[in-house]
Amino acid sequence: MKLILTISAMILFLITGCESGKQPANDFLTVDITANYPKKELILQDFLDVEYIPLETNEEFITSASMQAIGKNLIILRNKNGQDGDIFIFDRTGKGQRKINRSGQGSQEYTNIGSIALDEEKGELFINNYYSSQFIVYDLSGNFKRTLKYDKDFNFNSGKIYNFDQDNLICYDEIGNYKNLRKSAFWLLSKQDGSIVKEIELPYEHKISPFLSKGGWAAGPRNTELISQNGSWVLVEPSTDTIYSYSQDHSIKPFIVRTPPICSMAPEVFLYPSILTDRYYFMQTTKKQWDFEKETGFPRTDLVYDKQEDAIFECVVYNLSLIHI
C-alpha cells in the first residue's frame, strides 16, 4: 500500500492583503487560490536529502520527542506535554548528550516549557516560560544564566520563538489573531533583557483572524506563520495578500501574492507557504471552516510551483522510505 506524505505549512514567504498601495510588478509569484490546477505526483527523495536519525534510548533518555531546535551539531527535544520539565540534548548522530530539568517555582526555574530556542554558537537555551511572560536562559549544561522578562501583552504560547542573530530572538505573537487586534505579530526581542528591538510591520487594511470560536472553544489551522529559510524568514500574516521574505539585514520583499484578495472571501481561504527548494515552492490553501461537534474542518489543498516548468500544480508527495512498509 502506498503511503502519502502531505507537505503541510513549514516554510516559505508572506502575505499582504486588502492593503493600500500598489503591488510590486515583478520578482514574485502570483497564486490564484480558487483555480483548479492539474495534478502532479512527486517523490520526496527526488528533491530533498532525507536523513533518519535514531535517537539513543535508555533509562535516562526516554522521550515522547517534541522537536524544539536543530543546530549544526545538536538536536533539542522536550516531551510533548512540556509540563514535566525534561529537556533532552542529542548530537546529530542521535546520541544522548544530556538531560536537563530545572522545573520548579524558584527564580531560576521554569513552571512550563512553551518552546525552546537554541543559540548554538553561544551555547545557550532560551526556555519560553510563557505563564510567567519570560524566557529563562541556561547554558547547555543546564546552568542558569539570566531571565528575560517580556511584555505581558505578548502571547508566545504557540511556541514560535527562534534564534535570529547574535543579539536577538525573532518571535510570533498570535494574540491579535485570537482577539482581532490590529497589531504586529512579528517582533525582534533582545537576548540580553527581552526588550523590544524591532516591530516588523506588514501592511493590511483590517485584521482577519484564521481562528473560529464557539462556546468558549476555539479552533484554528495548524499551519506555521514563522519559519527560517536559507538565512531569511517567512512571515505569514493571515490578513494580507502578499507573502514576504525578511532577511538578516532587516530588508523585506514580496515573494508570493495570492488572489483573490483575502478580504473578498467568505469564508476566507488562506495561503500558507511550505518547503522551498531550488526547483519547487510548496504551499497549502486552508479554508476557514470548522465543525465543533465533529471536530473536523479547515479543508486543505496542497500546491506546488515548479520553477523549471513555470507552472502551479495540485500535488501529492510520496516517501519511498514508507511505500513498502
Predicted regions and their residues:
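Beta-strand-rich domains and repeat architectures in extracellular enzymes and scaffolds
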Residues: E51-G85
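Blade-loop segments of beta-propeller domains
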Residues: N58-E60, K95-E121
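Conserved small/polar residues in nucleotide/adenosyl-binding loops
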Residues: I323-I325
